[in-house]
Amino acid sequence: MKCTEKACAKVNLTLCVGNKRQDGYHEVTSVMQRISLWDTVTVQRGTGRDRLLCDAPVTEDENDNLCMRAVRVFFAETGLKSDGVTVTLEKRIPMQAGLGGGSSDAAAVLRALRTLYDSGISDGALERMGAKLGSDVPFFIRGGTQLATGRGEVVSPLPPLAAGWFVVVKPAEGYATVEMYRRLDEPGSVLVRNSRYMQDAVAANNVHAVAAELHNSFGRVVPKGSSLRIIKDALRARGALGTLLSGSGSAVFGLFDDREAALAAAEALRETWPLTFLAQPV
């Protein structure tokens, strides 16, 4: 038996990172939005042993991959017995981008296993499993538009954003998440903003108001020589209402209210940055 799931990327419309907690994590408040850029995850049961197949190079040991960790967590938490699971990944979401590709893949594996083993597990239970894998994984169980708090693993649904287009640009450089958090820990780096106005803008499906409220703590600590400013300027020159780093980077997105303008911008920027994508909220 097989089950295929879309593992969609996300962008952070807001990302406010607070001080480090005693457990080593940071307090986070983020309005997160799933977008129509996805990996394809196929899970097949009854293959004799657990294994991972991927059409892109996998940098870590197979057992350390989030998808295979998701397999182990699922069976450990449910008490079900694996009859051998093969996870096949077709990657399209860039890595080291702040778009949540690995976390979304892991969430897709959990959803597929729930279907294949007919376990009847609730979304809430899958979110708790996901929290054992990474802070972003719970968001991807349901996706849509959500408010993330805690270290990012506590998610609450928001009214869906049903307007606007995103042009997402991934430059050649990648940012290490651990290093970006370290930079935020330096004195004077943390700037906390309220996400309440963004929630109101999303609820109203007001793209101009959403663009006005885009903010990300990590934008203050990007490495010297980053392409961030150049990409943001290029997006604005092509009509973006607002631009922002997604997650801890290095992908940057521009928000447009018109599909044709967004499409033209994506085609133009792709000449300089090949990993440029047109997406909408889903």
Predicted regions and their residues:
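ATP-binding N-lobe of GHMP and related small-molecule kinases
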Residues: 1-97, 115-127, 160-161, 170-173
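Glycine/serine-rich anion-binding loops at beta->alpha junctions
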Residues: 88-117, 135, 241-256
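Short beta-strand scaffold segments in enzyme catalytic cores
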Residues: 15, 39-43, 136-140, 146-147, ...
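Short, basic/glycine-rich phosphate-binding loops at helix/coil junctions
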Residues: 48-60, 109, 206-214
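Contiguous, small/hydrophobic- and glycine-enriched helical/loop subdomains that border
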Residues: 83, 106, 110-147
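Solvent-exposed alpha-helices and their adjacent loops that cap or buttress functional pockets
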Residues: 33-34, 131-132, 138-141, 157-162, ...
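Conserved, helical-rich catalytic subdomain that frames metal- and/or nucleotide-binding sites
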Residues: 142, 146-242, 257-282
